[in-house]
């Protein structure tokens, strides 16, 4: 884990939901560590201390990936400000991995282009034809 401290979890876990690691919280994490720089597909929280909310946005956006993010706070207005500035396809507030088939799913940057689900995805299945005529 490149020096990060496993505060809880961390054991291998082949769960029914396709997870490969038990829910894990990591602390003592630096911005240059792989667990911060790469996409982590698992129930992993990377806890990094910060002084100002702007630092959170800078850290969150300082990666080539942007599939999803979670903002956890008591201040809903602060959460909305952060969510608007974080470059990710989905930002959850005080939750994670909430899905609804009516909402678009997709990332930004190297995490993908386009959207699945929602009305945006319907365009992928349409074959639009343009017909022009001189009358």
PLM regions with names:
Residues 13, 20-135:
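Conserved C-terminal structural/oligomerization subdomain of aldehyde/semialdehyde dehydrogenase
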Residues 3-12:
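Short secondary-structure junctions
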């Amino acid at each position: 884990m490149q020096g990060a401290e496993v505060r809880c979890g961390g054991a291998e876990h082949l769960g029914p939901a396709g997870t490969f690691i038990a829910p894990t919280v990591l602390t003592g994490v630096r911005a240059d560590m792989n667990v911060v720089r790469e996409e982590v597909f698992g129930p992993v929280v990377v806890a990094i201390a910060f002084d100002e909310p702007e630092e959170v946005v800078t850290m969150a956006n300082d990666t080539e990936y942007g599939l999803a993010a979670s903002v956890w706070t008591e201040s809903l207005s602060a959460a909305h400000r952060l969510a608007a500035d974080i470059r990710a396809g989905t930002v959850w507030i005080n939750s994670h991995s909430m899905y609804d088939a009516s909402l678009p799913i997709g990332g930004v940057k190297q995490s993908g282009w386009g959207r699945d689900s929602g009305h945006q995805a319907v365009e992928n299945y349409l074959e639009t034809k343009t017909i022009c005529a001189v009358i």
